[in-house]
Amino acid sequence: EWYTREEELDDLYYYAIRMGLEKQAQELGYEIFRIFNNDDWSLIQEADGIIALGKFSPKTIQDLESYGKPLIFVDSNTLYLGHSCVTTDLEDSVITALEYFLEQGHKEIGLLVGQEETADATPLQMDPRQRTFQQFLTEKGLYEERFVSVGQFSTESGYQMMEQLIQALGDDLPTAFFMASDALAVGALRSLQEHQIAVPDRVSL
């Protein structure tokens, strides 16, 4: 996995995926052993195959290829490299959520999103959720750059980003926010509660 053990605990998204993978593999009779980013990777030599969970740089992908094991990626689009992968249709999820907000009468919609890096600190391109959010609302004439905050995918970052938006926008705070992860939503909700901003009456998440 691209995370360390400590980092995974602050991102329930990847923790849930890993637990699901392990449960299904065990039900199928496979023995699973976990290797986190800061573990000894030489253990991979003992495996029959590799499930790589997370975001990886070209250099790290080459390192994984060098073991000569069957290799599949989860949450990384590696088809262009000739590797099988399982990914989420993030774009469709964003559009579905934004359409719901519009149906509920929201015209001012904000975004909290993380900027991901690979385990070896290689920056990734703009998050597809952020890109889709911007394109969709721009087409509707509703996109506001000041309603968008980019940080890390963690509860603490969600808290800090919402704190900054509350301070900067005051009464102009959007009536709805799309949260790019559960961890961000948890942190943002804590900030809103501390400021006694009613959810979902004043702000919907």
Region spans (language model):
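N-terminal helix-turn-helix/winged-helix DNA-binding helices
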Residues: 1-9
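Bacterial carbohydrate/catabolite-sensing allosteric modules
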Residues: 2-3, 15-32, 49, 65-73, ...
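Short, charged/polar "capping" segments at the starts of alpha-helices
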Residues: 58-60
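Short acidic low-complexity segments
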Residues: 35-43
